[in-house]
């Protein structure tokens, strides 16, 4: 038995202890592994599987590999379209040894259009550290080709495409919207497009969140390497920064970002910024910085209408290499009226259920999946949100209006702020008035919820699960 076989088998042993049997069978079993130059390469059967593992299982995989290799082996995942001629091992031998009869997806009857399966290997290194490395043209997840344009986002889409033109009318774009409506998609699409059309072999592109920007700056201060930090972000062709609202109240970081944007605009570079809030809604942000935000083009993104949702569902199904019938697409579009992440999640669950049951996607199956997301009796207002959140947290709704700073009350209130902002037409001021809080308190609370979810901390995962449960079972989004 080779070292590679031993390594992968040990990793699988560890993963079986960490993951549920169903998760291991569906996502880990189809992988093929090989080792080269001290790295473990994992080959997924499709782009969908690779992206799913990248988003949900990479922490478990990297921890298991680190445990087995003593922290010496790095991990990369690719689509199995051109596996190199290296010693490989799939779960076939491993499962035979362990007497596990299942070693991949069942032969499914789901309609598949092979023209939608990527023919190129897309390699994505599984991140280990907090700070992202600069993106290359091969590591962008989203592109303009996969963005569905509708009345809700056509202006933002046109503005984003304008950013990659030589004749761009502005050099700064500020995108704002509620969570899950396409800000990240458009931001990455700008980066991907610039990398593809640039006449330079390696255009300088920086893509990160405002929190990661802060972490980089703090690290440069600790290592006394501020000049390197400034050189990295001020000498770039395209600067993509998400979640600007994280910088509220952080004066030093605002000064650094202001200097960075000034430098970039001075050298003719392009800047794309995103936030859950429009510049005028930001609090405790330097007026000079807000002025810089407003000096470019401001574009908001709204919730998609039924027709746009239908087209998004069809497009997301193509990512899974599945052809969705018009009837099922229309049904889902009418029932799922939340954000785009909800549409993605429903399609993922629908496809996975069809594969696990080895059957075609039918209207009955769609209705079963929809039942996890909506109720037959729709209701949506601040009162229903307060009722649902207080019940989920085991708190009396009346006490949420108090001035208590106990952690449970703070998290529950912030969750209400987040849901009200995301799923109602209430302004930040109106939400604050309901709880006798200031506009800035509501904004800060929403930002804290988003930050914990993005960090995927224990608290963040708990909040995300609570939000998911509430949105599926207690609230009909409209």
From Swiss-Prot:
Gene3D superfamilies: 1.10.1750.10, 1.10.8.60, 3.30.300.180, P-loop containing nucleotide triphosphate hydrolases. Residues 1-72 are annotated as: Domain I, interacts with DnaA modulators. It is found in: Cytoplasm. Residues 137-354 are annotated as: Domain III, AAA+ region. SUPFAM superfamilies: P-loop containing nucleoside triphosphate hydrolases, TrpR-like. GO terms for molecular function: ATP binding; DNA replication origin binding; lipid binding. Residues 72-136 are annotated as: Domain II. GO terms for biological process: DNA replication initiation; regulation of DNA replication. GO terms for cellular component: cytoplasm; plasma membrane. Oligomerizes as a right-handed, spiral filament on DNA at oriC. Domain I is involved in oligomerization and binding regulators, domain II is flexibile and of varying length in different bacteria, domain III forms the AAA+ region, while domain IV binds dsDNA. Belongs to the DnaA family. This is Chromosomal replication initiator protein DnaA.
């Amino acid at each position: 038995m080779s070292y590679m076989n031993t390594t992968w088998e040990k990793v699988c042993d560890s993963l079986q202890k960490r993951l549920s049997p169903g998760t291991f069978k569906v996502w880990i079993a189809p992988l093929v592994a090989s080792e080269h130059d001290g790295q473990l390469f994992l080959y997924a059967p499709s782009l969908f599987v690779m992206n799913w593992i990248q988003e949900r299982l990479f922490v478990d995989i990297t921890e298991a590999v680190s445990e087995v290799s003593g922290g010496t082996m790095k991990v990369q995942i690719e689509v199995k379209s051109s596996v190199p001629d290296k010693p490989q091992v799939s779960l076939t031998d491993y499962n035979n040894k362990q007497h596990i009869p299942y070693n991949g997806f069942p032969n499914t009857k789901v309609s598949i259009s092979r023209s939608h399966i990527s023919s190129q290997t897309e390699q994505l290194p599984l991140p280990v550290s907090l700070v992202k490395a600069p993106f290359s043209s091969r590591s962008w997840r989203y592109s303009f080709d996969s963005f569905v344009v509708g009345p809700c986002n056509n202006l933002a889409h046109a503005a984003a495409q304008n950013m990659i033109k030589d004749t761009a009318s502005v050099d700064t774009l500020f995108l704002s919207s509620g969570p899950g409506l396409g800000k990240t998609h458009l931001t990455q699409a700008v980066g991907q497009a610039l990398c593809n059309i640039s006449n330079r072999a390696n255009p300088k592109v920086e893509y990160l969140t405002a929190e990661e920007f802060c972490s980089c700056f703090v690290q440069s201060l600790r290592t006394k390497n501020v000049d390197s930090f400034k050189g990295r972000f001020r000498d770039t062709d395209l600067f993509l920064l998400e979640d600007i609202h994280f910088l509220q109240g952080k004066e030093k970081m605002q000064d650094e970002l202001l200097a960075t944007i000034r430098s970039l605009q001075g050298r003719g570079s392009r800047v794309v910024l995103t936030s859950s809030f429009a510049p005028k809604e930001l609090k405790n942000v330097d007026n000079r910085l807000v002025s810089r935000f407003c000096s470019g083009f401001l574009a908001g993104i709204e919730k998609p209408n039924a027709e746009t949702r239908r087209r998004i569902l069809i497009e997301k199904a193509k990512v899974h290499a599945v052809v969705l019938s018009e009837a099922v697409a229309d049904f889902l579009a009418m029932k799922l009226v939340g954000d785009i992440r909800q549409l993605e999640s429903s399609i993922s669950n629908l496809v996975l259920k069809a594969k696990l049951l080895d059957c075609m996607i039918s209207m009955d199956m769609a209705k079963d999946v929809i039942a996890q997301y909506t109720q037959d009796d729709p209701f949506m207002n601040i009162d229903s949100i307060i009722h649902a959140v207080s019940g989920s947290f085991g708190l009396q709704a009346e006490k949420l209006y108090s001035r208590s700073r106990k952690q449970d009350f703070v998290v529950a209130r912030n969750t209400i702020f987040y849901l009200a902002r995301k799923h109602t037409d209430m302004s930040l001021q109106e939400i604050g008035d309901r709880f006798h809080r200031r506009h800035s308190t509501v904004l800060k609370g929403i930002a804290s919820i988003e930050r914990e979810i993005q960090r995927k901390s224990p608290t963040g995962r708990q909040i995300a699960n609570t939000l998911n449960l509430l949105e599926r079972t207690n609230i009909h989004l409209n």
